[in-house]
């Protein structure tokens, strides 16, 4: 007989820094086991925010799927800024190159709703514009 799913939650933790807390307690899962497995699974992504989808079952067991780091976090890291512009229409807080956009899009491809790298790049460019980050080299991009 299949296990009954009690809850599915989308959370974000820093890689290798998941700790038992209120977010996990509300799921009713074995918190020490989750934190140990999550921290082991994210060893190669140290310092990054890691979104995770946790499926909790009625017997306190769980499954989780790691997602790619959020686009906004990656753009801030590449642009070396702490936060985006408060008004992206009038402020530019940083600039990034089209090559930076391409590398982010290639990394994010599995989680994006895009069939081509160009479509993924357009999504990343849209996020950058909304954050007040200017993209250089756009004349080469269609």
Curated annotation (Swiss-Prot):
SMART domains on file: RL11
Protein keywords: Methylation, Ribonucleoprotein, Ribosomal protein, RNA-binding, rRNA-binding
Record has Mitochondrion as a keyword: no
InterPro entries: Ribosomal_uL11, Ribosomal_uL11_bac-typ, Ribosomal_uL11_C, Ribosomal_uL11_C_sf, Ribosomal_uL11_CS, Ribosomal_uL11_N, Ribosomal_uL11_N_sf
GO annotations of cellular component type: cytosolic large ribosomal subunit
One BP term from GO: translation
Pfam families membership: Ribosomal_L11, Ribosomal_L11_N
GO MF entry, a single one: large ribosomal subunit rRNA binding
HAMAP family noted in UniProt: Ribosomal_uL11
Binding partners and assembly: Part of the ribosomal stalk of the 50S ribosomal subunit. Interacts with L10 and the large rRNA to form the base of the stalk. L10 forms an elongated spine to which L12 dimers bind in a sequential fashion forming a multimeric L10(L12)X complex.
Homology family: Belongs to the universal ribosomal protein uL11 family.
Annotated function: Forms part of the ribosomal stalk which helps the ribosome interact with GTP-bound translation factors.
Protein name, per record: Large ribosomal subunit protein uL11
Lineage: Bacteria, Bacillati, Mycoplasmatota, Mollicutes, Mycoplasmataceae
């Amino acid at each position: 007989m299949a296990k009954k799913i009690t809850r599915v939650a989308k959370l974000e933790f820093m890689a290798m820094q998941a700790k038992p807390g209120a977010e996990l307690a509300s799921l009713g899962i074995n918190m020490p086991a989750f934190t140990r497995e999550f921290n082991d699974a994210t060893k190669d992504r140290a310092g990054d925010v890691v979104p995770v989808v946790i499926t909790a079952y009625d017997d306190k067991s769980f499954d989780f799927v790691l997602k790619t780091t959020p686009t906004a976090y990656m753009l801030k890291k590449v642009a070396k800024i702490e936060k985006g512009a408060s008004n992206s229409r009038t402020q530019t807080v940083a600039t990034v190159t089209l090559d930076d956009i391409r590398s982010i899009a290639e990394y994010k491809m599995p989680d994006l709703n895009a069939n081509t790298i160009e479509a993924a790049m357009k999504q990343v460019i849209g996020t950058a514009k909304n954050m007040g980050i200017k993209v250089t080299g756009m004349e080469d991009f269609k």
